[in-house]
Amino acid sequence: MNNEIDYSIYESVDDLKAAFSINEDKRDEPKGSEKPDKVLKADKLPVVYADLNIKKYHNIFKHWIIFTNDRSDENKTLKNIHEAIKDFDMKPELHIFVAADMDAEEDESRITIRDDEEEFTIEKESNLDTLVFARLGVQGEDECEHAVQLLQDRGFLVLNPIRPSQIACDKYQSACLFEKGNIPQPRFCLMTKEDFYDADSFKAQITRVYPDYNFNDPDKNKDKDLVIKILDGHGGTGVMLIDCKRTTAVLQAIFAIDPERRLIIQRKEEGDGGDIRVHVLTLRNKQIILAAMKRQQLGGDFRSNVSLGAEAVPIKLTPEQEQIALRTAMLSKLPWCAVDIMPLVKGSNKEIGDNVVLEINASPGTFGISEVIKRNFINVMVNELNDPSEFMLQDKTAGFVESINIKFADNVHVDMLAKLDTGNSTTASTMEVGKFADNGKEISFKVGGKNLSFKKQKSMIAKAGEEQYERPTIIVPEITVGLRKVKDVRFAVVKSRENKTTNVLLNRDVLSRLGYTVHPSTAHILTPEMQKIDVSRL
């Protein structure tokens, strides 16, 4: 696996830098942490909490699709889901598939998913009334990943999408992502067998964790304990706290057993005996803190995982903890995640602050948090998913010119060449047409060799220098760009001009609804190039 962080979930690193005030000149791309910048430079994010006192829960989804490894009654998440359904005003149809036994296929309008016990065919147009749960433990199954990808690409809401989940469950990649976003965390480094047996590399890596580490006299490294983690561990497994004097012996033993193992080594921070788990829902235009709990360590174990027996209790977050949780969740591109924060002993690490992020969880458990808040957590979360326009599609980069399909009335489809707006000046999408006529009630025109007529909509006022003029508008039922569709798109209609390369302009609002960002200098990233528009056909 490449050691570099994968930024494929962002359309550019520049957006990440701008959002989190990162000065890239101060960093190369280290294999571990450098001295962190002052954390959380950006303006404060609005803090919104889920309402835990509502009496009736609202569900807008007709179908819930669950991908799991286990249908049995022992599956606590499934148990929570079954219990949650009883409390909703609209009961969804539940479709459960075991990942190891399933497959999926699609045709022009439908996706079919099946396993040994169930088969379900869903229309692609049902993307806004279907909720998909894809737990982390099942995404490693090839057929499950294929099904999740099909649903993601068609705009279904998936908790959680594949690529952000993969980054979150790789402790090194997520640590690099936190560093890029100025999220406070323990100093860290990546350690491989090659690093360990190369003296210079080993020293360089450990120095990233403790810059003043004494390699000549280990006895002088008092209070320089290390936390060693395997990259794909979860639930507290694969985590070790070691005395600095035992570093060499422990690493030697690990690499003797598994020479290919990659480890992340972190500085042991001075915490207060537990950590805080914050569940966050990140939508297109808002974030919601769903619930939070503090997990107390038990029996001298430095870990605080509920699955290992730690005690969980309610907690009121500090303003700093709220901001850290929200920014970490936003950075991850996960619609639903749990951020684990460790409060530090006051003043124990002045370069970081009073809290550090330990990790982010793309598939958090729901049982422990349900007991703490005395509500079924699934109810609380789904109740907040009440506006399809807020569903956070995974960003994908489109070219500044793409071939699109416009669906007009009576199921008339026309392929057209569109320019995708890279600025913010356009107030409406526009369509250039031929043989334009306006009788006051209807407008008619010819496009793509087809004669069409529309009920006239409210005109749009456009500006050209100091002049203002009206443009009639129409609403088309649907447009398709790449693999994504958006319904009810308003276009301002204008007469076609000669030698025009494109005859459609999609504005920023439409692109936002599609979930695309635009590459300013590359065309046809999503679709094959069409021939230049033949104006004579208009």
Provide a role label for each language-model segment.
Residues Y10-S12, L16, S21-D28, K41-K44, ...:
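Active-site nucleotide/adenylate-binding loops and adjacent lid/helix of ATP-dependent enzymes
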Residues L45-N53, N59-S72, V132-F133:
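Short hydrophobic beta-strand segments
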Residues D70-Y197:
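Conserved N-proximal alpha/beta basic substrate-recognition cap immediately N-terminal to
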Residues V209-N221, G347-S348, V401-D415:
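A short acidic-Thr-Gly-centered motif at the start of a beta-strand
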Residues K224, G235-E320:
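Phosphate-binding site of ATP-dependent enzymes
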Residues Q266-R267, D275-R277, L334-G347:
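A short glycine-rich, hydrophobically flanked beta-strand micro-motif that places a catalytic Asp/Glu
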Residues E311-P319, M330-L334, P343-T397:
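C-terminal active-site "lid" helix and adjoining low-complexity regulatory extension at the edge
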Residues L393-L538:
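Pepsin/retropepsin-fold aspartyl endopeptidases
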